[in-house]
């Protein structure tokens, strides 16, 4: 097989694709972009209950003013009004400007009119120009070299700093910066001087500088025509703060002497990155010092850290006042604060100390006044925001305590998280005073404990707050000789029995394993509180209800079977219903030592899991190995009519096996899921060598070359082969991306994600051999379908959510989610492709990467982002599915317009979109504050799956391939209608690589 030119992913494209991947090596911004015009989640839901969620002419209702988010929104609107003055290089003429404003205001209604005039159905995107994904940095050497000759040293005066600060504060990209960040950037700008006629920027030339006019006048020239002037205090080159791109105008000096302040994009973003990283680390450290949060998980602490708000106070300014209602926790980051009660000074708070923690739990007035003694900076979080990103704090803390205790329990340790959550949800929480007998033998309790504990009573309990002593009863006569000298015994006796202290349990500990394992065993201990105590009690009836009527042994057996089957691909992605039915179909069979279980050469029809005992595997008379408890064998017999490759015999006096027959399995798993499993197992079984591949045709072209359909000659299996030119990779400085792409693809194993079979390399190319996906792009499918209905949108969005959820569970950010990067398989189910932008996240990322229309605000800005960026793209896709155009920048002519619309544009819904559940979900996904974006809280994707939009959708049947896809592909669909045989290729034996190609040694 010879060399092909290539693309870094298995993709097919339109003749004029709107695509491709991206990896702009630049820093991007932070978790707190400007808030959306969409109401915050709670507000949005409130508005949904009104008469209408859409205002006249497709306008979305505006949220009322007052909250910090809404105040930021108003500031954004004011900034938009100032933009024409602040960025005059984008002005052309007054008439053109007014026309542009009209277009922006009527953008969505104009789309509606087009749709109404069309016969039907509504079309996706219309004639919009969609930007390609940002891939690599443009060369700015020419501009950089020219500007170097104008650079001068200058000490900034107070008036200089004031001018710079004012300009930065009104800049859209800088709108989310705090005072410290603006100050750092003001100190980072450089001074440039110019003479009349000097050129600052050239139209079409790539640039990386953002400028503020210090003095003089400059003219704006577009296509050799002067269209505007730039005066002192005005700025230009805003797009350069986001990424290097071609200048849209030439800027030339008009004055005899003129000067600019300028900052390079790399300096700008590196400054923000350093500040953001340092602030996050500091805030995380401060949060760790709050004892109140010590029972939170690391992930929960990170969520809170991302949501912390920085607040500054001047000397003498009250931070909180005694008697006022409190709902905010404050941590001092710098400065000092005086605590006073009833006008009496009590103490002084220093850096790292905190106050107001009770305000997060209880509706009670402040117990003291706290006043800044000097300039003081605090980080804070309010109860409302905390509830939105984490949930009710007390419930979260208690749940964490119980979850950790269950995971350490000998009985519950093997329970899956979902089962543990159900157990936690069934407990009863009760408070007890000091020295209270909470439980006694045979479940005798004080009368105030209520009839709750009648029948089988309490079987298990957790200590949430306080401390309890646990006593055992012993026969007094048999232990009298030792009890007098035992410090752990109690002198109180009941009849001929006396109490002996056996344990003292504190917060986070639990008791009752023996009573869970023996449901009918009478409670034989005494539990007493050592102080005010809060317990969570699990009763026998609650335990039975939670376990679905099964006893604990049956549940443990079920969990063991579940854990074992989920290790195998053949069972891993069955639906929950299919899995439950399969596990219940297992029967127990016993064999005695020496008895053959299966015989070499016979046709297999059973799958086995070892419950107890040991088996030996024999090839002929040769002993190969032994298998023990919870090992398994024979799974291939469920899918294939194959002869057994070995004999398996019992190797202990008794061997108990869980067994399922093939005919039972085929009654449970059938149709599309069975076909999918057969194809996947066959693909995994095939041992592919490069020399055995035959090129059939080209199916796609991209940045690095082509994608080819190839056939494996020995088995006739077909695959897609992406052929990546090493020279192109090196020229575009993409070595790390290609290597990471391979690493991530090799780890992926999900039915809705493209499967990498293996990789090859030779002197000129790298090769990705993947499964062949023949149904075409989702991008084309939604254009065939027209505007998607509720079920169609549910099907595609839910499939995408499951694929991205799988990646996020492995801490992988996809970062270029869009319909072009999703293919349909022959059954109409989705396959996520193109991992050229994916990244294994460790902390926060700062790289600007992805396709502009689908970028989250925090990616565009410069202060870091996490996995939340992918969740924003869910909202863009859903909007495109159901509304037609893109939500932001649909009619934009350049990337700056797209970015401006994403950061500050209104989210407007066409009049023909009437599904209020869908509208609400879009608003919550397209929330500019990632901390409160649905799917980004500590609940993760559970909040999306349980949203009202999916209330009538069966996620389980989707996973089991038991739903009808919106579009069933007819035949095979490829973008590239290439001639048979693809490109002419030369044979290559894989000659030794030169040293400079060491980066691709893993291929």
Swiss-Prot record:
Residues 86-109, 127-141 have a biased composition (Basic and acidic residues). GO terms for cellular component: cAMP-dependent protein kinase complex; cytoplasm; plasma membrane. The active site is at residue 816. Its cofactor is Mg(2+). Serine/threonine protein kinase which acts as a downstream effector of the second messenger cGMP. Monomer. This is cGMP-dependent protein kinase. It comes from Eimeria tenella (Coccidian parasite).
